[in-house]
Design a protein with these regions (language model features):
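Flexible, acidic/His-enriched mid-domain "rim/lid" segments that flank
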Residues: 89-179
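N-terminal accessory/capping or targeting/presequence segment of soluble
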Residues: 1-99, 155, 164, 168
Length: 179
């Protein structure tokens, strides 16, 4: 359950984690945001702190529905980063990620990575990020045994109530369709 996240992070010796990708069709991101039409986002959770959702400006309303603290990517001048990176998209993205992590107080320690993005993109960005922040250790986990999966296996009362509400809604829709 979400209330166990910090305990699970401590048990895995993770100081923070990052989730990349869509708000939907991305179980780790969906778990924290509740879904929504967010096509490109980054969620950063530092142990002991609430998660923060970084998003595109056009997705601010959908991001706000998550109830998380939201910061638009536009806070970081991507065009300037792109130029500074020699027009290397992967490096510019890693530079922005470095700024986001530093803003949240993450510049050293073990950082888990989750989410669904193109493998080539992910590898490139994370390789650059490791060079930009040499005091962090980027940690990957097997999908079926990850921190996020372990958290999703148990539910607190808020999560159970949400499941019940969705079950009720689904039953009503099926009944209306049948009739």
């Amino acid at each position: 359950m979400k209330s166990d996240i910090d305990t699970l992070m401590q048990a895995r010796n993770l100081d923070a984690f990052v989730i990349f990708g869509h708000g939907e069709h991305n179980p780790p991101m969906y778990y924290f945001t509740g879904g929504g039409h967010i096509m490109h986002a980054t969620l950063i959770k530092r142990r002991g702190d609430a998660p923060v959702l970084f998003h595109g400006d056009m997705e601010r309303d959908e991001a706000a529905k998550s109830g998380l603290k939201c910061i638009p990517f536009s806070k970081y001048d991507y065009d300037a980063l792109f130029e500074k990176a020699g027009k290397d998209t992967l490096l510019a993205t890693a530079m922005r990620c470095e700024l986001m992590l530093r803003e949240l107080g993450v510049s050293a320690g073990r950082v888990g990575v989750y989410g669904t993005y193109d493998l080539g993109w992910s590898f490139g960005v994370l390789a650059y990020l490791q060079k930009l922040l040499p005091n962090i250790e980027i940690v990957g986990e097997a999908p079926g045994a990850s921190l996020i999966v372990r958290a999703m296996e148990t539910k607190d009362e808020v999560e159970v109530e949400r499941i019940r509400a969705m079950g009720k809604l689904t039953t009503e829709v099926v009944a209306q369709t049948r009739d």
